[in-house]
Curated annotation (Swiss-Prot):
Its EC number is 4.2.3.4. Pfam families: DHQ_synthase (PF01761), DHQS_C (PF24621). Its cofactor is NAD(+); Co(2+); Zn(2+). The keyword S-adenosyl-L-methionine does not apply. GO terms for cellular component: cytoplasm. Keywords: Amino-acid biosynthesis, Aromatic amino acid biosynthesis, Cobalt, Cytoplasm, Lyase, Metal-binding, NAD, Nucleotide-binding, Zinc. Belongs to the sugar phosphate cyclases superfamily. Dehydroquinate synthase family. Coiled coil: none annotated. Pathway: Metabolic intermediate biosynthesis; chorismate biosynthesis; chorismate from D-erythrose 4-phosphate and phosphoenolpyruvate: step 2/7. This is 3-dehydroquinate synthase. It is found in: Cytoplasm. It comes from Leptospira interrogans serogroup Icterohaemorrhagiae serovar Lai (strain 56601). Its main location: cytoplasm. It catalyses: 7-phospho-2-dehydro-3-deoxy-D-arabino-heptonate = 3-dehydroquinate + phosphate.
Amino acid sequence: MSLIETVPVNTEHKSVPVHLHSNLSGLSEEIAKLPGVTSVFLITEKSIHSIYSKYLERELSSLPIKTIYIKGGEKSKHINRTGEVYNQLIEYGADRKSLILAFGGGVVGDFAGFIASTYLRGIRFVQIPTTLLACVDSSVGGKVAVNADFGKNMIGSFYQPEFVFAPLSVLSTLPDREWKCGQAEIIKHSLLSGGEYWEKVKTHSFKDLNVDSTILPYLIAESVRFKANVVSSDEKETGLRKILNLGHTTAHAIESVTKYKKYSHGEAVAIGLVTALLLSEQHSELDPVTTKETIESLKNYGLPFQTKLKSKQLAKHMLHDKKNVGGSIRFVLLKSPGSPIFDIPINSEDIILAIHKQKGI
């Protein structure tokens, strides 16, 4: 049996198990537990499917499955791309008892989840993350969305999968950059969690990340457990769940300014974490030692901690962030590791000064 651990995400209306597996073995058994599935649709990227097709075919050979390909990259996760996928599902005869399998990274998971949440007013789906970033973040919690011309994840919903199946063996094919991107979210979760988790993250570096290491399952499980606890208490992001946006206000501005071409999401989050911590020093009395330790950890994992993008340009793009209220830019800040605060209004001048200070570190 390839099961390593199952972490439950308990929400008001549903309990979603997150299964951490060493490989794809056991996926078909989990699908078989779902009642009344009439057909299965795999939504994935061709580049991902070509690597794992033989393993998927072997594992899912007993299922009536059809594959729908989408293009890779954040640009493909656009509202304009949904129509062709809806049409394919209609053409293939997908009904309300059909099941969608989202096999890929965060883009595939977000896109396929959004399709599942809206097709026939909602059909079941399963998250099968193939990147470290998706394993610890986007596949867990039920957020699904697509992008609009003027913003990331502007059109979406909260829609829980039937389960998450994370096969760690697929991570072995990830390029170094993808490993590092996932680590940015792990660092974020450890800062929010504090305690032993934060201390553990600080003592490791990029060279420790591989599918055969003992630390990797620990880091993933702790991240999933932390996020599961947050989501369980606030599924719809009306309060506590907002803390998971630590670093993301700056990150989304960076991605938007560069049109998703220069920085990966994880790299943008890494830079955004430092911006948030510098603002935390000013607005929530964070000890500067935490900022220094975070920068050191980012370096150890090969992640950026500053950008050459213009401070004013980034601040301008933050005005369009979906977390804003009444035109006020809202940040998640940190009082100390394990003690985040959210919905903190920050004026553009302070943001510009923080990013400017960040450039000089």
